């Protein structure tokens, strides 16, 4: 096991090195080049206090807030404030003198008791996934807008099948049967984070982004890959799985990763012992994926979110070779394997720029503005189910968000331009997004 700040590796690209082993000052500069990128699952694990146990069920984090009593405790201050406001509105005669509920007129007393009972029943019936974020937790551009109605997927949509080497072939047999009808597929990957940072002279900012992605994809191995299938309207099969989480063979003792990343991944629910013994061989996975009917077919629509790393790991697996030296060759390979795909991050960014034209004018604001998948899901009214924090759940959330956004917008941007204009464009790699 190796910390990412102790022994940087050396990778030559165009005569330059990705890491310098010469001086400690250069290592310090590399540490300040940018924050390490983590997946949503790892980011959630970073929020856990040290020493707090994390319960997992079927590889997903089991949130303990399903307990109605804990949920009531969490919302009790807000509920008390609402009750006080209601009492003030319903008690115009109470000026300066506190009046107990027992001393109120009979009709008002019964009304208040009924309202309190209804509020308590609603609080008890609400699960964790149906809780909307508080106003203080929302982005600024959402605080002044009315919340959309909740889009509640059917229960069978929220099932994620864990795939190990023991059931790899049987699950791909299911995928082959579904592809002809459910030809929209989303992908999400889990890896240890960005450890490599290129140094040297680059042709552009886009070239730097590609070389960073290229270094990390060549350097690291994926831990999990999520796939989810639906039709163009977001419909899924009534019976059986339509979202899968593929668990690859991964031995932390042989991989390059920091101690911090290892602990965060363990907290997020990754069972490295099981990955080491029961994990899927990535090249066996690539052969089955090529025969699944998903690849090299323009009738299949791929959905990603900030696609660079997801597509990078997938192309690296399918090629069984090092990443291409330049982004043009990489894009060629992507379009060969996936001729029809959308980067939902780019689509969401363009929609937000139509809503806030000043974002297009200020490059500094563009860098500060974050367009996360969770924020998009909140705007679309998708509840925050705990399954969405897993790798397979992330692919499911991408697919649900894209299909819901397409239905609400009729697959068009606010100016009437069709989403197809940005088909096959990778956010951060193609152009200066």
Swiss-Prot record:
It is found in: Cytoplasm; Nucleus. The keyword Membrane does not apply. It comes from the Eukaryota. One of its GO terms (molecular function) is metal ion binding. Changing residue 97 to A: No cell-cycle stop in response to glucose deprivation. GO terms for biological process: nuclear-transcribed mRNA catabolic process, deadenylation-dependent decay; nuclear-transcribed mRNA poly(A) tail shortening; positive regulation of transcription elongation by RNA polymerase II; transcription elongation by RNA polymerase II. Its main location: cytoplasm. This is Poly(A) ribonuclease POP2. Residues 81-91 have a biased composition (Low complexity). It holds the Pfam family CAF1. Subunit of the 1.0 MDa CCR4-NOT core complex that contains CCR4, CAF1, NOT1, NOT2, NOT3, NOT4, NOT5, CAF40 and CAF130. In the complex interacts with NOT1. The core complex probably is part of a less characterized 1.9 MDa CCR4-NOT complex. The modification Phosphothreonine is found at residue 97.
């Amino acid at each position: 096991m190796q910390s990412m700040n102790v022994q940087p590796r050396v990778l030559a690209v165009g005569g330059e090195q990705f890491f310098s082993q010469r001086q400690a000052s250069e290592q310090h500069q590399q540490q300040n080049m940018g924050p390490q990128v983590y997946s949503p699952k790892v980011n959630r694990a970073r929020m856990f206090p040290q020493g707090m146990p994390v319960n997992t069920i079927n590889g997903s984090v089991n949130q303990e807030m399903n307990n109605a009593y804990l949920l009531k405790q969490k919302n009790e201050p807000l509920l008390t404030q609402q009750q006080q406001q209601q009492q003030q509105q319903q008690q115009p005669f109470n000026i300066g003198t506190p009046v107990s509920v027992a001393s109120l007129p009979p009709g008002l007393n019964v009304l208040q008791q009924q309202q309190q009972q209804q509020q308590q029943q609603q609080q008890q019936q609400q699960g964790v996934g149906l809780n909307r974020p508080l106003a203080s937790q929302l982005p600024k551009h959402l605080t002044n807008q009315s919340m959309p109605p909740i889009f509640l997927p059917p229960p069978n949509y929220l099932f994620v099948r864990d795939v190990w080497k023991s059931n790899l072939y049987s699950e791909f047999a299911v995928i082959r049967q579904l592809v002809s009808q459910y030809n929209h597929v989303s992908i999400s990957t889990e890896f240890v984070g960005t450890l490599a940072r290129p140094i040297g002279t680059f042709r552009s900012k886009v070239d730097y982004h590609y070389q960073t992605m290229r270094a990390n994809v060549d350097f690291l191995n994926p831990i999990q890959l999520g796939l989810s299938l639906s039709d163009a309207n977001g419909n899924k099969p009534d019976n059986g799985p339509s979202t899968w989480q593929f668990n690859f063979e991964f031995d932390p003792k042989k991989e390059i990763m920091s101690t911090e990343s290892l602990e965060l991944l363990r907290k997020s629910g990754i069972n490295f012992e099981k990955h080491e013994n029961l994990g899927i061989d990535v090249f066996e996975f690539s052969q089955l994926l090529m025969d699944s009917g998903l690849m090299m077919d323009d009738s299949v629509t791929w959905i990603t979110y900030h696609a660079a790393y997801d597509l990078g790991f997938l192309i690296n697996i399918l090629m069984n070779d090092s990443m291409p030296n330049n982004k043009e060759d990489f894009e060629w390979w992507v379009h060969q394997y996936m001729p029809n795909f959308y980067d939902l991050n780019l689509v969401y960014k363009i929609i937000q720029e139509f809503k806030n034209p000043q974002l297009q004018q200020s490059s500094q604001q563009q860098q500060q503005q974050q367009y996360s998948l969770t924020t998009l899901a909140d705007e679309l009214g998708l509840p925050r189910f705990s399954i969405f924090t897993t790798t397979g759940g992330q692919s499911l959330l991408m697919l649900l968000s894209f299909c819901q956004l397409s239905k609400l917008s009729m697959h068009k941007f606010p100016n009437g331009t069709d989403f197809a204009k940005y088909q096959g464009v990778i956010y951060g790699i193609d152009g200066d997004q």
